[in-house]
A protein has these predicted regions:
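Glycine-rich flexible loops
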Residues: 1-119
Length: 119
């Protein structure tokens, strides 16, 4: 997932493994500003994550992960075990996504009906 973060790309929902755990693309945040980086970096990272979900109208309970641009992935859950599980699934989806994009660069998102069926 760090590869997607470094590239500044959302991780699209291309398959049912993704849809079983995440309701749509996993967003990548915007670049952090110089002020955010030089200020309270950890706090500002959290703020950028929150703003990403708010500005895109996303529900963090439905997409329990984010990619922080030029940094890496963050995942959460109902408890520590759930957060770790979501992080593992995120890594697997990112791995599969990389190959999917290589094989089919113009691959569209999965059908909304299939996303809804699996989520």
């Amino acid at each position: 997932a760090t590869i997607w973060s470094q590239a500044g790309l959302d991780l699209p929902a291309w398959g049912t493994t993704h849809a079983d755990y995440f309701y749509g693309a996993i967003p990548c945040t915007r670049l952090m500003t110089v002020e955010e980086i030089n200020g309270e970096y950890e706090y500002q990272t959290g703020e950028v994550i929150i703003k990403t979900f708010e500005e895109r109208g996303l529900d963090p309970a439905q997409i329990p992960a984010v990619l922080v641009h030029s940094h890496g992935p963050f995942a959460w859950g109902k408890n520590a075990a759930d957060a770790v599980h979501n992080a593992v699934v995120l890594e697997e989806c990112a791995y599969m996504g990389l190959f999917s994009r290589q094989l089919a660069p113009q691959l569209p998102d999965m059908q909304p009906e299939l996303l809804n069926k699996h989520y």
